[in-house]
Amino acid sequence: MDSSRHGLHPLQNSLLHQSQMDIYNSITGIRISAIPYNFNSYDQFKQYISASFGIAPADLFLLTAFGIKLKFSMIMNGDVREVYVFDRRFYDGQQMVDDKLDTALESLNQCEMLNMIKPMRSPLENADILRFVSYLKDITNRPNLSTEDLDLNKLRLVLNSLKRSSGWAAALLSDLKKTNYYKKVNEEVLCDNKKEIEIILISHNALIQYTNLMFKTLEKSFNESVDSLIMLQEQSLLENWKSYYQILKGVRFKGNYVLSDLLDEKMLENVAADSKALMGNVNDKLTRLRSRIDSEIISKRVMINDLYESLKKKYLDVPNLNSNSRTENDSDTLNRLTELVNQVVKDSKELPILDELLTTSGGNSTTLSAESVKKINVLVSVFETHSSTIIPQITELSNKLYDEKVEALNLKQDLQRTLLSDTIHKIVGVQLSILKATNLINNDLSKNISNLDFNELKMSIVKDLPLVFGLWLAGNLKKLKWLENFNKVAFKANEILEMLKFIESNYRSKWIDGFSKTNPCVNSNQGQRILALQINEDLKQQFVRDHLASSRIVLKTGSNVPTPGGSKGNSRAPTPEHDPHPPHLNAINKLLHNFNKDYNFGNLRQASEEVVRTHSPATKRDDRFGNQFWLTLIDNITTEDFYHYIDSLKENKVNIKVIKQLEKNLTDLGLGRIYETSNDKVISAGGGTIGPLNSQDTSYMNLLKKFLKNFEINDVTIQINISTLETENGNNNEKEKEPSFSNHELLQGYQRRVKKLESLLYQQSLHQSGPPPINMAYPPIRDYQQRSSANLMTSATATEMLMDTHARIHDTDMKQKRENVDEIQVLQTRIEQLQANLEQTSKERDDEREQKEILHLKLMKRDEEGDEDEKINGLVAANHQLQIRLEALQKQNQELQSLQERNNNEIHASQEREIEALKKQVVQLTEEKTQMSDEKDRLDLSNEHWKTQYEEAAMMKKDLLDNMTAQEQEYKNELNTHIKEVEDLKVKVENLEDEEANLIEIKENYESKLAQNESHFEELESIIKSLYGKLRLVIERTFQNVVTVCLMLEAIGLLMKRDEQYEENDPSNGIRIHRVKGLRSRRRSTTSKAASPLGNDEILELSSQIVAEADKQLVYFHQEPVKELESLETVLDFKFNQDFDKFTRLTYMDQKLLVESVTKRFKDVEQLARKLQKESNYSKTEIDGLIKEVNTRISIKDFKVGDLVLFLPTRDDTINMNMANTVEAVNRRASTVASFETYQPWAAFNVGAPHYFLINDVSKIDLNGRDWVLARIESMEEHKVTREGHRRNVGNPYNLNPDAVWYGVRAKEETVG
């Protein structure tokens, strides 16, 4: 890109060149460059590539250097510098046959112009020219060489051949350079075809890398599928879901209701059967897919890699193409060729012209001068040097370079043929196999694994139902608890409002009484009425009653309005928001479906109890455990019901984590219980079944705090004193001492520490749940692939094979865990303690944060009153307590880490030992499998060989018997034929003996007729000689006519030529007449000496090749007529049947074509003449106008006759005196300088050194009293001042310097009009 053209700074231009992107054609190896910033979209980029390589945009497939599919974002971000272009038409997966392959190669290499630069013969390689040059060399030694001794046409031909030879050499060198045969890359000379071969191989390496990426994606998907299957098999409930179901049968709720009745056992059995079938199906598909991957993908990928390496060695490591000596020799060859061509061009420029070769010694003499003879000798010497030395070297070097170019091109085409016929088909085949396998994994296998996972999720409800049902109970209990908390808060609010109303009413009564007593004028009981306003009892009551709002909080749940201290039960709206029995849900899903419902609580406790009483365990399952029944039953749940459910879980040995989680939920609700160490008696944590609803009740306190905080306004903050609340609730428990203040940085440290402990607890819990699934690669699948298909009938057996290696590792882990069960239990106890401590710390942290806010506000209000020392002491004490707690937690954390590290090290060591043992077994099994496979392949090959040998021997035996039978039959037929022929011959012999006499008589008659025929043949021979001579004359005249016609046509700029391919029925025999520009200028003069009609001199001067072709057919006419009959027959049969017919076709002139061509040419000439005549007339008019315009302008230099000149008088007095003294002499030389009427000379105003002085003959111009004269020059006479006469007035009238030139000008004054 030209930076100046686009207005770019040189630095910007260099940056653009650095950001250029190379685009390579993967089949042809052609490279183009582009700037990424020139493209606004991906489609525009593809259009550019399509226009550059001739590939449709829909057929483009683009890759980057490492086989990554090109994206437009890569181009815009400058992340890619190389793009490889693939044509989808050649990568369709179908193997090309020979015809299609040849067509494809022809279309790919149609841009190769190698045939156009093939070296042609030199113009000097002509036998006639060589003979003439030899003749010239001999005659130049003559003393008096005459022009009559030279053939001027041939001499001109020699001169022209030398000049055309220089053009031939220069064109040859230019063609080789234009093909970019060599170019410098990193200071190394490389062949373009080698670079193209490298590009082709690198492009297909990128395609192989793309295939490898596809395989890695397939490998990842396959491994994920295997891992998913193994994980599902490890965690599957397929074998032990019934044990969990039996546990559910022992878990009861409210004493009579069994938890297993919520599940459909028959549906669970169907799901388990479906899972078993799916597991076997997935296992079989993975096994078959592994076999297909090994046979169709992995082995072929190895083969493709080997094939690519072989192509690199074959086409890149070619000794003749890539050796350094070859590169240096080629460079030397090109330099040597350049030197020889420059020498030929230089010699051609120094050649004499034809006139210099034909210069005579005198005017009328024909003898050549010595200089001409010398130049002829130089011409002969140059011709011999070129023809014998330089031209053969140029031909040899150019042929060498051309052959190397052809060799490299053939190597490239061979690579293209190999790729298109075999390599590309194999690469695309592997890609198709990868796509099929990927689709199988993503569609079929993924769907089956998803179904299997979904079935496992269905069966997991058997294991998770105790926790799910417990959470459902906790959620409902929380709603009941919240309703009670809300009722209490509402009741307290009503009391407060009523109290405020009572206080206001009492205050009004007191105030109105006092007001009436202190103002007697308004008291109606005091004497006379002064004011119109008098206060009586009715008015007092009205004053107290007016504007006293009656407020009451009424809880509305549906259509029921409970009293403030009403029942603690809840009620439900008559119509639920959702359908209680969705048809697509089973019993447990119905339960889970109702988790998100919103219920309205009311006074339906009695109705619920009736429902519970009416449904006994003996009732049918569908009626007893309907959705509405369970919802109504759970509405009546109490804390004791929840604890009985937990006790039932413990009795049936349900997982301790489930129990701990449920107990934690109760604790969060403030419904936790404590156990006495003596007899484990259950004690309620407060009055009532759902909590004490006092300061010890966390949920109640949270709701109360939120309620009170909502009454805060600007500049008003509400502080909650827990001891005050406890006193109001009548609770006499001791106040728990709380820290007054907590440092902010210390709280942040606690938060970070708690998060770290939570992370450690989570990791330990994961470790206790078992080792993570092992990411099994291909070797395990190879192991179970070798087993017979008979062992794959059931899913259990298939699963055992697929998990062979992993099962042993898992068994070892289980054994190790059983050995360390004591340590794990101790660790678990420590973890539970730490978890409880962490929970307690979290709660304390929340309380501390709230207390901090409260105390901070108190400190702000009491800042002026409080003592600073007491505040600091309180902060220090709180900080000290927190530090003690932090040290205890750190100590516990260190103990936990040490136990965890010891346990991890022991487990890790045992697993590594087991893995090493398994690896050795795998290697051993793999080696055994390989040996058995090799032995099997060897036996198969041997069996195939002997089977083939047997089949070939049987076939040969059968063919031999058939041939013997056929030959025996032939022999019998031939014998019968020979016997019959012998009998026929005997009959013929007898007949011939009878005919012998007749033949003797016929012979005598034949001899007499033969004598007569000889005389006739002599007469016929003379006639043939005469006809042959006349025929030769006609042919020569015909040939002359053809030459004349070609000369006439070329004289008018037309060239007659013949098409190489023409139809047989073409009347003109393929002859065409074309107009050729510049042909007339090359046409030699027709007045030169004419050559013989059948000679080659005239033919060489013609541009038409038809005359030369016709002349080749006239060779046999130069011979004398043959005399012998055999020779005559040969001439008649061969010459006249072939050459003569060809000659007649070549010399036949189509009259219509000739007349039309000449007529059209003359019409064109006439039209051109008219056009030129118009242009000439227009130019003449313009010239006349310009002449008139020029004639009216004053000339100031280079004067000539007819110019209009301005004359001015001179001011040199010496010139005037000289003119006065020499006036007499001047008058005497009137031819040189005319007389003057005044002694003052006048000179023309001019620019330049020459002096132009006015010569006024006989006062032709009146100069008296005039300052200037405008006159037109009539004549000028040049004078020069010599050194001898510059001091004489006559020789130097104007007193000029020696050697000065001056002009005497005669002019006529220009007048107006």
Curated annotation (Swiss-Prot):
Region of interest (Disordered), ranges: 557-585
Topological category with respect to the lipid bilayer: Peripheral membrane protein
MF GO annotations: molecular adaptor activity; protein kinase binding
The keyword Methyltransferase appears for this protein: no
Keyword Cell wall biogenesis/degradation: no
Described purpose of this protein according to its UniProt entry: Involved in cytoplasm to vacuole transport (Cvt), pexophagy, mitophagy and nucleophagy. Recruits mitochondria for their selective degradation via autophagy (mitophagy) during starvation. Works as scaffold proteins that recruit ATG proteins to the pre-autophagosome (PAS), the site of vesicle/autophagosome formation. Required for the Cvt vesicles completion. Involved in glucose-induced micropexophagy.
Assembly: Homodimer.
Annotated protein name in UniProt: Autophagy-related protein 11
